[in-house]
Amino acid sequence: MQTAITARDFFAAKLQFETDPSDLAADRASATPPLVIDVRSDAAWSQGRIPGAVHVPNAELAERASSVAPDLNAPIAVYCWGPGCNGSTRGALTLASLGYTNVKEVIGGFEYWAREGLAVVSDTGRSRQAPDPLTAPVA
């Protein structure tokens, strides 16, 4: 059975379940920062990640979720590579299916986090690239 939904309701609901890199950076500085989960492969994790993120590949997420995130109501942000990757959607669905109530997908993923000039960590150290003018707000 199809239920009608207004455009307003659709977009309001959508914003409840997604965040972007800039908003995630601001949320991480708040009093209740989200747990950030990287669901990419080991190789991708080694290449670069959001500082402070926890690495739980999608294939392991259902099994490890309760040890990584014991509070079902805590804020969680899930990311993968970028806009062409649906790993964060699958990860967020896994968590929601397990009963987590405050899960958001990071739209743009790691790619847009880095392109916005936010700090990244890799196995070789910490870095920050100049913001890409096509993705980062001009000051």
PLM region spans:
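Glycine-rich, highly charged phosphate/nucleotide-binding loops
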Residues: 56-65
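Short loop/helix-cap segments at secondary-structure boundaries that form the rim of catalytic
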Residues: 45-51, 113
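Flexible, polar/low-complexity N-terminal or interdomain linker segments that lie immediately upstream
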Residues: 1-47, 122-139
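Conserved beta-strand scaffold positions in the cores of enzyme catalytic domains, especially
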Residues: 36, 53-55, 103-105
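Short, flexible helix/strand-to-coil boundary loops that buttress conserved ligand/catalytic motifs
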Residues: 28, 49, 65, 117
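Short, hinge-like loop/turn segments at secondary-structure boundaries
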Residues: 54, 72, 119-124
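Catalytic cysteine-centered active loop of the rhodanese-like fold, especially the PTP/DSP P-loop
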Residues: 65-113
